Amino acid sequence: MPQQSSSNSERSLEVDGNRLTLLTDGPERLAALIKLIDDARRSVRLLYYIYKDDEAGTLIYLAMERALERGVEVSLLIDSFGAYTPDEYFSPLVAKGLSYGRFHPTFGRRYLIRNHQKLAMADERIVMIGGFNIEDSYFGSAEDGAWRDLGLLVEGPAVARLARYYEALAEWTHDRSGKIRTLNGIIHRFNENHGALQWTFGGPTRGLSPWARATSRDLLSSKDVGMIEAYFAPTWAILRRIGRVGRKGRARIITAAKSDNHATIAAARYTYKNLLRRGVEIYEYLPTKLHTKLVVLDDIIHIGSSNLDIRGLYLNLEMMLRIDDAAFAGMMRGYFEQEVAQSLPITAELHRKRSGWLTRLIQALSFFLVTTADYTITRRLNLGRF
């Protein structure tokens, strides 16, 4: 079993009767995830976009197997588009009682949807959320070239509310004829609008997804904005709101300098010119590939699975936690400052020097494709190398 990293101590605070613990290192996230499953006594619910049958996947597989042998009910949902691991890999666990479902896109509107959510829940008592998947590259270190990401452990009454959402989503996933209208109903029924901790969701709804509406609404009154966005290609309306904060207060964005999809970097850079003009500070994270999804708006935090891009805003099934708490926001601003210190400041002069006409054309084309097509398509086209 992997050991928790000693370089990043757990950061933990209580908010509205729930214990929130931030996990910043890949190895400590994997250790915490395995412990969550091993400590379960009644139920384990897992939901991931990617599940790869590598070393990390095997460790989680074995933890699920141990849970099943203890008599724990175990459920696993993965996405067909994101997870290439064949169903046969999980067959021995299914034979032992695993409830296994795969989000299958079909032709029509449902084909466009990805189940991009990530969570691991035990006993309706504790849940781990974040942007990471089940794959070695999400649990390593910067020296390994692993993704930089975040995990958040939530322990308390908020977990039971999320469990009911999971069960409704699992029922819809197992129904191959499930209607988009039914899915919309699930998203809106479980989306929360009150309290210090609010579960907010995304999906194929009309207009912005509920989580995106909450974020956009919070932006309107914000004076101090900090965003870490691995894939940054939002709507022009959201870009304008960020720009207004840049003019009247302070707005800072950390985007990726490294990725496995160069088109997403180019698409983000396409937005820089207008943001820099409005006083927004932009940084690119240097140590390794960036996968973090974090928004800090004054004393409000949005953290979870969704990128600030068109798919995350309108289409993908996403899960975010909105946290309204000054102490927790202060802790997250401290984390943000640490990431800024490891990032390259993008000045207007630097952006101009590295943005010739051909580069600008590639950026515009990448922005168009990222906001209209699937990431897999842009990754295969490899447009963003420049």
Please identify what each model-predicted range represents.
Residues 1-386:
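Charged, low-complexity intrinsically disordered terminal segments
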